[in-house]
Amino acid sequence: MQHYVTPDLCDAYPDLVQVLEPMFSNFGGRDSFGGQIVTIKCFEDNSLVKEQVELDGKGKVLVVDGGGSLRRALLGDMLAEKAAKNGWEGLVIYGCVRDVDVLIQTDVGVQALASHPMKTDKRGIGDLNVVVTFAGVTFRPGEYVYADNNGVLVSPKPLKMPE
């Protein structure tokens, strides 16, 4: 597992990276994570999140545009454990998570807005691998995202930690 330090990436690639507005907190068991972006756009329905974490996620980060909803949790312990088991590097969720005491012990990165105990409805509604924009940044499938306790940033190309 590669360790990323976002301030060092910003210093090394100032013209390449875009930094998200500082509204995310780290809820996962990894302090830092990064990888190729897979996007989901959904609202209070995590059907596609469930579907994607069951697939191989090696080298990938699931970016979920949940519309910023603070009324339902798009990720909980069971889906986080599936994501870890299937090799996902992490998830960036523009929305809420739950089961935070378990998430922090799960070997996957999780950045989200807040915690909320209510689960979502599963209606099968959402879009996969579409361009999404939140926190002042646009996420394109196939580009790259990096996160740590300092923040979250996006790059059109893979980044290497400076020596």
UniProtKB/Swiss-Prot annotation:
It catalyses: 4-hydroxy-4-methyl-2-oxoglutarate = 2 pyruvate; oxaloacetate + H(+) = pyruvate + CO2. CDD domains: RraA_family. Catalyzes the aldol cleavage of 4-hydroxy-4-methyl-2-oxoglutarate (HMG) into 2 molecules of pyruvate. Also contains a secondary oxaloacetate (OAA) decarboxylase activity due to the common pyruvate enolate transition state formed following C-C bond cleavage in the retro-aldol and decarboxylation reactions. Homotrimer. This is Putative 4-hydroxy-4-methyl-2-oxoglutarate aldolase. The keyword Aminoacyl-tRNA synthetase does not apply. Pfam families: RraA-like. Substrate binds at G76, D77, M78, L79, R98. It comes from Pseudomonas putida (strain ATCC 47054 / DSM 6125 / CFBP 8728 / NCIMB 11950 / KT2440).
